[in-house]
Amino acid sequence: MVKERRTELVQGFRHSVPYINTHRGKTFVIMLGGEAIEHENFSSIVNDIGLLHSLGIRLVVVYGARPQIDANLAAHHHEPIYHKHTRVTDAKTLELVKQAAGLLQLDITARLSMSLNNTPLQGAHINVVSGNFIISQPLGVDDGVDYCHSGRIRRIDEEAIHRQLDSGAIVLMGPVAVSVTGESFNLTSEEVATQLAIKLKAEKMIGFCSSQGVFDEQGNIVSELFPNEAQARVETLEAEGDYHSGTVRFLRGAVKACRSGVRRSHLISYQEDGALLQELFSRDGIGTQIVMESAEQIRRATINDIGGILELIRPLEQQGILVRRSREQLEMEIDKFTIIQRDNLTIACAALYPFPEEKIGEMACVAVHPDYRSSSRGEVLLERVAAQARQIGLSKLFVLTTRSIHWFQERGFTPVDIDSLPESKKEMYNYQRRSKVLMADLG
């Protein structure tokens, strides 16, 4: 048992090291809604933020205060007013907003300052800086309704923020900002986080919600969404009456951020202990990413991919599932291979060997990394190889397999005799291996 834990620790560390190096020196904007701050797991989140800082990541933390503001309004018997799902901040509300936001700022600053206590990094000092880095302006009047002290961002002093980040500080920003006239305005945390991420050219924007991310109809976490897909989710949630949940607020901001140059926005749960670390330091993460370009790419292989392909297929060759290929053979045939890569790891491959005279192609060397065999990568490869075969005028595709007969049959392949093979392939057929021949029409 102890040995298994040690092995798991070593493997986890090996997998995380590339991400530690990748993230060092990058700017992340972390959005903490008021719901996350109220949750019992908040102390762990703060500790993990302190850990990110110790790894050399430049952090801007944006906090919201919606539930705290609502509680403060209720305690003072002041009814909240909304117009078009935006809070109307009258003078009384503004005072209560400033109270709630000010208390949170002090509390979060104190927690971040002591976040590395009771860890091996105890004694390391974290500077937390807040300031008038954002200048606001009023939302104004809409349909005869004056939003009063509800505002929007007018400009951001990104140079001043960068100076603080360069000095090693964590920058903490809340939902209240001043204007050029000295007035205070109530902003939404998603606007603050989104505009900061855009202006600072942040590598990532990270948000917390009550669930683990976005789910599909089967209840599975959707690991990646493109901006148009995320926007569709927002519209669906709003149609269901959800305008203020952590999920919908973050997705709105993530769509804007992604379209404005922020490479990845991550939505994770504030209820899951260690979700921040799992999302940032593992290949598959734990939540949902909004991305312009997928972390997973399917493409033709090049000579630089030989090492990754060999690492993927060697275990299957040793088990007798695949026919052994030497490095030299792979080098000569690399143009026939298609691979799927995830964060520079080759997780699947397949090759297409055409027989132009017979208008038949062979799909061979199909391999999927053990961690991804329960997913649809095999089908993705099959579709890509079939498309490549059609493009070069082939009408049929065959496979030789000893283990995956049913998998191919479920996808339109039927068993055929060896005589159905192209003549040159038939001459090389290994009668000792006794592979089954399955063929599919590409029409």
Curated annotation (Swiss-Prot):
Pfam families: AA_kinase, Acetyltransf_1. It is found in: Cytoplasm. Its EC number is 2.3.1.1. The keyword Acyltransferase applies. SUPFAM superfamilies: Acyl-CoA N-acyltransferases (Nat), Carbamate kinase-like. It catalyses: L-glutamate + acetyl-CoA = N-acetyl-L-glutamate + CoA + H(+). Residues 296-435 form the N-acetyltransferase domain. One of its GO terms (cellular component) is cytoplasm. GO terms for biological process: L-arginine biosynthetic process. Pathway: Amino-acid biosynthesis; L-arginine biosynthesis; N(2)-acetyl-L-ornithine from L-glutamate: step 1/4. Belongs to the acetyltransferase family. ArgA subfamily. Homohexamer. NCBIfam families: N-Ac-Glu-synth, PRK05279.1. This is Amino-acid acetyltransferase. The lineage of its organism: Bacteria, Pseudomonadati, Pseudomonadota, Gammaproteobacteria, Enterobacterales.
